[in-house]
Amino acid sequence: MTTNTTHDRQEPNEDDTEPTYTLGFVCVQNAGRSQMATAFAERERAKRGLEDAVEITTGGTHPAESVHDIVVEIMAEVDGGGIDLSDGTPREISTEVLHACDVVATMGCSTLELDADDVDVRDWALDDPDGADPETAKRIRDTVEERVTALFDEVEADLSESA
């Protein structure tokens, strides 16, 4: 994993009171790991009160038709009432969107080629939960959650330093 890096922030919109930090979560199909990462990131953003400061985007280079069943199943078991991904829809992500991110986390499967000096691209090198047994899929889920939490620790510290 890459070490913490300070990033240039996007200028705030007229309605914003804080600078915006943008995180991207990407994999090929956007049907497993990146969906879990996005869900955990949305939860972490709300828990830390960073809704106005952190934007989250996700997508795949070749999106699937739907979120993998095993991912929907194991995310429904997450502590605190579960996270419902049953209506999640994988989507394609453009290079333009990724260039607007401060950090892009790829899940270890991406064919992403992002040539941008101002984007911190991190390859989390996670196994694919699709086709995995439930225990393996849960371990992958837990690793995704840990990495998202650690990323938000960095983001929160970075935002505090620039405030």
Question: Which ranges hold each PLM region?
Answer:
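Conserved active-site segments centered on acidic
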Residues: T2-E92
